[in-house]
A protein has these predicted regions:
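Conserved ATP-binding subdomain of kinase catalytic cores across diverse folds
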Residues: 2-3, 9-117, 197, 213-214, ...
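Activation of the activation-loop gatekeeper triad in protein kinase-fold domains
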Residues: 187-191
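ATP-dependent phospho-/nucleotidyl transfer catalytic cores
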Residues: 14-18, 69-81, 96-166, 171-185, ...
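All-alpha amphipathic helical-bundle segments outside canonical DNA-binding/catalytic cores
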Residues: 244-256
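Active-site activation/catalytic loop segments of kinase-like enzymes and analogous catalytic loops
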Residues: 194, 198-242, 258-277
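ATP/Mg2+ or Mg2+-diphosphate-binding catalytic cores
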Residues: 262-329, 334, 339-341, 347
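Short acidic (Asp/Glu) and glycine-rich catalytic loops that position anionic groups and cofactors
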Residues: 2-7, 180-185, 208-215
Length: 348
């Protein structure tokens, strides 16, 4: 007996569901054609060819059910590494796909310059008279604008290639085998569209490696756990080392800072304009979120040299050798044996 999963697409959040499903169809067909041994998400087609059904009750799709487990958060570094491999493999399998064929399901989603421009415009307009109470957060975000916009600026200068990106690389968007905890398949492809590899890497790190939840009220506890960072980077680069350009590799560390700052601008802009986009549980929820992302970004600044060194070390090792699937490299950037993860102190 086969099991299936029926979903109704949220057409309020995604106002172009047909194009969204076409994006998914194109990338999953590419994966099945070029990498038939890989498991990929698959939505079934009607006789007329569409991989969706529209009726009076909504916009529907049908996929195979995959027996599995998911993790919202996880301290098991092997699971984190496997998640990194899953998202890295997703990138690798689509490295030869022309990203310009895809529709932008959320236009300007990671155009950090435009996010900042919108924040500054709303700051000037101050529609809800809230700017005065968040002046300190605004001033810090504006002080790091150029650093936060580095990925956008490099792409606009033609120095980074356009890739197919997932754009929601949380660990809970990977299905894992219940017994072995090996990654089975990447899911939730609704935001698949053109982007930069740093968007996927940076957002995964921003979410997975923070010591606290993104709405922790004690922002001083926020920071990047370098053990988790190392684990994810190692898995990700094991799969992508051969396909990434050196410029892309050099931006992976700063991408984490950029994505934290970008999300902080979004939370803060939403607060300034009346909490219209993100769901809130209490009046200052978006301020709390903003402060937590700022604290995370500040902590990343203090660890940026280590973050860049970890990425460079993993990339150099994996691009130059054919390591067996379960073989563990022993050299680390801090000169200690990797058993199995030994990055600089996560508490530093």
């Amino acid at each position: 007996i086969k099991s299936y999963l029926v979903q109704r697409v949220n057409t309020y959040a995604f106002q172009h569901p047909i194009e969204l499903m076409q994006n998914i169809d194109r990338v999953t067909q590419h994966i099945r054609t070029k990498h038939p041994e890989a498991q990929s998400l698959h939505f079934h087609h009607l006789e007329s060819g569409e991989n969706y059904l529209m009726d009076d009750d909504g916009f529907w799709r049908l996929s195979n059910y995959v027996p599995s487990i998911t993790f919202d958060t996880c301290d098991d570094l092997n699971v984190v590494r496997n998640a990194g491999q899953a998202f890295g493999e997703f990138q690798m399998m689509l490295a030869d796909f022309d990203a310009s064929q895809l529709f932008y399901t959320i236009p300007d989603f990671h155009d950090t310059r435009k996010r900042y421009a919108r924040l500054k415009a709303d700051m000037e307009a101050d529609p809800c008279s809230r700017v005065a109470e968040v002046r300190q957060e605004l001033e810090w975000l504006l002080s790091v604008e150029d650093e936060a916009c580095k990925l956008t600026d490099l792409f606009n200068a033609g120095k980074l290639p356009l890739r197919v990106t997932h754009n929601d690389t949380k660990i809970n968007n990977v299905l894992f085998d219940e017994e072995t905890h090996k990654a089975l398949v990447v899911i939730d492809l609704d935001t698949v569209m053109p982007g930069l590899v740093g968007h996927d890497f940076g957002d995964a790190i921003r979410f997975a490696s923070n010591f606290v939840e993104e709405d922790c009220k004690d922002a001083d506890k926020a920071g990047v756990n370098l053990n988790v960072y190392w684990a994810f980077a190692e898995g990700f680069l094991k799969k992508t080392a051969a396909t990434l350009t050196e410029n892309e590799v050099d931006t992976l560390g700063i991408s984490c800072f950029a994505l934290a700052c970008e999300l902080a601008t979004r939370f803060l802009d939403d607060y300034i304009t009346g909490d219209q986009y993100f769901k809130i549980k209490y009046p200052d929820h978006n301020i709390v979120r903003t402060r937590c992302q700022i604290a995370l970004a500040k902590n990343m600044q203090t660890k940026m040299d280590a973050m860049k060194a970890i990425v460079r070390d993993c990339w150099m090792r994996y691009r130059s050798s054919d390591l067996e699937d379960n073989k563990r490299p022993t050299k680390t950037v801090c000169g200690k044996t990797d058993i199995p993860f030994a990055p600089p102190s996560a508490a530093a």
